């Protein structure tokens, strides 16, 4: 339940075995073994049915997003704001092995209590995000032309996130992006 209540967390849900039925923004989704979804704090998540095991990987913007990451692997990057739909990834066996190495390292790092732990956790998180970004780019066959379209979607979501209280019209965001409202 805390996973569903905390509105500040970025989330990875990774089905380890069986299936997981969820609702994201009132849209039902069923995830199978070795599938991952990425969610932002703006997504409303409801876990409907757990028929197996899943790993939840969560972090808040104070831990990761405030650092100077480039657009591709930031909280405003491809995984979290690259499309208008929820990012759902099907992992190959080799991708599962690579991501499992990182999650195993994270588990080990949690046991080490020293002044370097936070930075090491941040590095491992970035590695996890980079690998998932590569998997997503491969899935969506991101070419240089398509990259521009994804960048536009990313920029739009960042603007909405930052200005939604005072800006209500598509025209407002189109002006900030120097675009016609019809192109958004």
Name what the model sees in each region.
Residues 21-23, 39, 44-50:
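Short beta-strand His + acidic residue motifs that chelate non-heme Fe in jelly-roll/DSBH
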Residues 90-93, 113-120, 132-158, 162-177:
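Short, Lys/Arg-enriched, Trp-marked, Pro/Gly-tolerant hinge/linker segments that flank
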Residues 1-30:
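Generic protein-terminus/edge-of-domain signal
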Residues 48-108:
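A hydrophobic/aromatic-rich effector-binding and dimerization subdomain
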Residues 11-14, 98-102, 124, 128-131:
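Amphipathic, well-ordered alpha-helical segments in soluble domains
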């Amino acid at each position: 339940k805390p996973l569903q209540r905390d509105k500040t967390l970025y989330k990875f849900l990774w089905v380890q075995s069986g299936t997981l039925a969820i609702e994201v923004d009132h849209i039902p989704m069923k995830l199978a073994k070795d599938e991952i979804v990425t969610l932002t704090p703006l997504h409303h998540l409801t876990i409907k049915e757990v028929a197996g095991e899943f790993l939840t990987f969560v972090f808040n913007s104070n831990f990761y997003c405030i650092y100077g990451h480039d657009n591709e692997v930031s909280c405003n990057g491809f995984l979290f704001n690259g499309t208008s739909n929820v990012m759902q990834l099907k992992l190959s066996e080799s991708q599962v092995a690579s991501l499992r190495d990182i999650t195993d390292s994270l588990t080990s790092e949690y046991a080490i209590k020293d002044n370097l732990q936070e930075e090491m956790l941040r590095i491992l998180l970035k590695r996890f995000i980079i690998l998932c970004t590569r998997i997503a780019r491969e899935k969506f066959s991101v070419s240089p032309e398509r990259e521009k379209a994804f960048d536009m979607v990313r920029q739009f979501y960042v603007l909405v996130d930052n200005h939604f209280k005072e800006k209500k019209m598509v025209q407002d965001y189109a002006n900030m992006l120097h675009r016609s409202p019809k192109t958004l």
